[in-house]
């Protein structure tokens, strides 16, 4: 079996790279390894970067002029001054012009952290300024910068050569604008095809729902659904109410797949889940007459309602604590046992206060209030 042999010739432009190798330099590498050498030696050439005049070539013609590149193309170019004595650069072509956008980005050395260059972003507009039509062609222009990094190079030499990286910005469905359709249960997606105008495509409602569920910004993070759409839960009416009626109303998976918002109201949430709101408002059945709040003192043959009423009357007539008749609190009465056997016997209750004791309590209360008011 013959093994292919690749010959690397570092001196010519006719050499080929093995499959898988791409030219993807960093911003710092473009400045220090390519642009600096071109500024110091105008005859320097690279097998990956071609020399072109950007003012005489349209953006869609540049891929054919490049030496290599699939989606990004690199070029050496000289700045064309708009005026002989000015510093403004002529960026116009026959079909349009390049317009700068945003701020220039600084490029620092990874070893010395010194400023070595600047990167400017430009967008190509078809037509003439200021009514040009924006296209999807973008260019990154690299130039030398740094007072201490290139102190041995004159200012005119540093501004003479630049490296331009040209690429075509993709604007597909990931960046397409989604607008509501007029009818038919779908949505209209605006997709730009590159050089041509944007086209509007009608998509089904199932696809448009996927577009609408995407968050509009990073601060609005989509919350997970409150219910798992892949799980089918079974709710019955008997589990939601106190009634003994067994009406098996099972919630199907189609009702659960509905997305429940965190801020949905109770009627909308229960309607989406297929549940009956009235089943939650049913009152429990009334307690029977044989219900006893004190099962320890229960008697099977005696009515408990009369016993509980007598206990409340005795409890409401207890004397105040701290009164002069505190001795009556220690006196107790032994209640007789209830009829029928199994009753309560030997229970001690305080005797109700008499009228004289109540008058003494009122006198003590007025005396205490007089002390507070006269203080």
Swiss-Prot record:
Residues 210-247, 373-375 are annotated as: Involved in transactivation activity. Induction: By BRM and SYD, at the chromatin level, and conferring a very specific spatial expression pattern. Precise spatial regulation by post-transcriptional repression directed by the microRNA miR164. Keywords: Developmental protein, DNA-binding, Nucleus, Transcription, Transcription regulation. GO terms for molecular function: DNA-binding transcription factor activity; transcription cis-regulatory region binding. Pfam families: NAM (PF02365). The keyword tRNA processing does not apply. Residues 215-228 have a biased composition (Low complexity). Its main location: nucleus. SUPFAM superfamilies: NAC domain (SSF101941). PROSITE patterns: NAC. Mostly expressed in buds and flowers, and, to a lower extent, in the aerial parts of seedling, inflorescence and old silique. In a general manner, present at the boundaries between mersitems and araising primordia. Residues 203-214 have a biased composition (Polar residues). It comes from the Eukaryota. InterPro entries: NAC-dom (IPR003441), NAC_dom_sf (IPR036093). Residues 17-169 form the NAC domain. GO terms for cellular component: nucleus. It is found in: Nucleus. Residues 175-228 are annotated as: Disordered. Gene3D superfamilies: NAC domain (2.170.150.80). Residues 116-175 bind DNA. GO terms for biological process: formation of plant organ boundary; leaf development; primary shoot apical meristem specification; regulation of timing of plant organ formation; secondary shoot formation. Transcription activator of STM and KNAT6. Involved in molecular mechanisms regulating shoot apical meristem (SAM) formation during embryogenesis and organ separation. Required for the fusion of septa of gynoecia along the length of the ovaries. Activates the shoot formation in callus in a STM-dependent manner. Controls leaf margin development and required for leaf serration. Involved in axillary meristem initiation and separation of the meristem from the main stem. Regulates the phyllotaxy throughout the plant development. Seems to act as an inhibitor of cell division. The NAC domain includes a DNA-binding domain and a dimerization domain, and confers the specificity of the transactivated target genes. This is Protein CUP-SHAPED COTYLEDON 2. The gene is NAC098.
